[in-house]
Amino acid sequence: MNIWLSMLTTTGLGAIIGGFTNHLAIKMLFRPHRPMYIGKFQVPFTPGLIPKRRDELAVQLGKMVVEHLLTPEGIGKKLTNEEFQKGLIHWAQVEVDKVITNEQSLRHMLGKWDVAHVEKEATEKIEQVITEKIQAFLEEYYTYTWEQALPHSVHEKIENAIPNVSAFILKRAIHFFESEEGKSRLSKMIDDFFASRGALLNLVGMFLGNVSVVDRVQPEVIKFLGQDGTKQLLTDVLQKEWEKLKGRDVKELETFVEKEMIVSSILSAVKVEETVSKFLNQSVKQVCEPVRETIIEKVVPKAVTKGLKWGGENVESILNNLHLAEIVQQEVSTFSTERLEDLVLSITKNELKMITYLGALLGGMIGIVQGLLLLFLK
């Protein structure tokens, strides 16, 4: 009975010692958090292993992440994974659709993104571009003649319109001279004519009488204006003037209208500020609705695919520029010892318990062996 009690005692003591030793060893990985002193002498094994080697641990963790976890090969493989690409495209389509179907105005969205000043900048930029384009256009066309500047189709239209213009002018002239105003004007012209020709013509005028002269001249003037020959004559005159105009430089226009006035007139007609304001007052949905399907079905998938392809080709350069090892090192270095302990324990809690239990098991087995040795020795 005493033998079995001795074996039980040695086994129990071995298990307790083994379990406690392993438990103490695990605790000594983290504790104490700070070095302890007796007088001027530092107590051995203080601070614990991890607090003591925290800086080295941070460096090694950074290297481990870069060299073994977030490797260019691993990330590149993930980026080219078909399922990953499909999932990312679907996510991007959903997120982009939320943005382009927003009922808020563009102005409100710009204000939310703290870029409300874009309205003023856009107006100024558009006006600047229009001004530069007009000035460049005028600089180029001022070196041409009208014949060179105007398209061939315009030449044809003008030349075809000349006979119609002649007919219109003569028609309006006939209508004018048939009116009382025209007759009165013709009468005044006759009076002025006779007045400028001296006494003899005045005598003829007095003899014939002014009214009779007007009455005789008016039908003849109207008859003259209505003749085909008159129309042809006016057409020929206009045609000659048109030919002269075609040979003249466009730059002569600057004599009558300055460039700045042309630019100012066009900008006033375009109303850039008002146009930009109206555009920004529209909702995002209104602006994007016509191209919504194209954006979702074509633009987004193509953009994501190209982005992933570029990322896969440049992943090593990206990782190098991110300096991940330094980031991990800096983050771990900022952890308090308590947080670092909690982090490690949260990951290895079960395994560390098993190590404690294993120590107790081994201690118990050693106790059994000791008890058997004592039994045989007796």
Swiss-Prot record:
Annotated TM spans? 1-21, 357-377
Give the primary localization class: membrane
**What topology does it adopt in the membrane?**
Multi-pass membrane protein
Under the heading InterPro entries, the entry gives:
DUF445, UCP032178
**The organism of origin for this protein:** Bacillus cereus (strain ZK / E33L)
- The identity of this protein, by name, is UPF0754 membrane protein BCE33L0760
**Localisation per UniProt entry:** Cell membrane
Q: Which GO terms describe its cellular component?
A: plasma membrane
Name the coiled-coil region(s): none
- Family per similarity comment: Belongs to the UPF0754 family.
**Keywords for this protein:** Cell membrane, Membrane, Transmembrane, Transmembrane helix
